[in-house]
Swiss-Prot record:
Family under the similarity heading: Belongs to the protease inhibitor I35 (TIMP) family.
Name listed for the protein in its UniProt record: Metalloproteinase inhibitor 2
Annotated site location: Involved in metalloproteinase-binding: 40, 61, 67
Leader sequence segment: 1-26
NTR domain boundaries: 27-152
CC terms in the record's Gene Ontology section: extracellular matrix; extracellular space
Length: 220
């Protein structure tokens, strides 16, 4: 093989390596409004993690053991979920595969949304809504009790750039990224998308229950 051919093969090999996904890129999530996270989750709780360990969780198709991280938690309040308290939370062992890291020791409280596994267990990923409790606004905390649930039939559409539009009356346009370059902006912190009596949806601000006039069509 000539030098030119060897150089070409080397260049092609390097190009292939450069285009392969890196482990850190393996977990990719689309931003969601807190209300969407609430509505999409099976379980939403306020809790502390008290201990952690790695456990086997069955085998893959090749017979190799599947490892997961198990957090033993102390549930403080359940906003959505089964009648039984959640005792254990499971997640993947690495952030590269969307695993979540929680502080243990029982001091830091979290709002945790995820998928139910039954028997007091749930599973979480980096794509779920998991944030320290003390970072939530007072409106977000109060909306967990009832407000977000009122809008689960509505659709929140994120606007990544101007122009953007809604395609149906049951949508609310989420503008935080355009107006504040953040997914944790004003609409995320202080607004919920609520269905009105005619089936349309609109942003509602505040911690107080929506007025009947708002539900019966009133500009927010």
């Amino acid at each position: 093989m000539g030098a030119a051919a060897r150089s070409l093969r080397l260049a092609l090999g390097l190009l292939l390596l450069a285009t392969l996904p890196r482990p850190a890129d393996a977990c990719s999530c689309s931003p969601v409004h807190p209300q969407q996270a609430f509505c999409n989750a099976d379980v939403v709780i306020r809790a502390k993690a008290v201990s952690v360990k790695e456990v086997d969780s069955g085998n893959d198709i090749y017979g190799n053991p599947i490892k997961r991280i198990q957090y033993e938690i102390k549930q403080i309040k359940m906003f959505k979920g089964p009648d039984k308290d959640i005792e254990f939370i499971y997640t993947a062992p690495s952030s590269a595969v969307c695993g979540v890291s929680l502080d243990i020791g029982g001091k830091k409280e979290y709002l945790i949304a995820g998928k139910a596994e039954g028997n007091g267990k749930m599973h979480i990923t980096l794509c779920d809504f998991i944030v320290p409790w003390d970072t939530l606004s007072s409106t977000q905390k109060k909306s967990l009790n009832h407000r977000y649930q009122m809008g689960c039939e509505c659709k929140i559409t994120r606007c990544p750039m101007i122009p953007c539009y809604i395609s149906s009356p049951d949508e609310c346009l989420w503008m935080d990224w355009v107006t504040e370059k953040s997914i944790n902006g004003h609409q995320a912190k202080f607004f919920a998308c609520i269905k009105r009596s005619d089936g349309s949806c609109a942003w509602y601000r505040g911690a107080a229950p929506p007025k009947q006039e708002f539900l019966d069509i009133e500009d927010p």
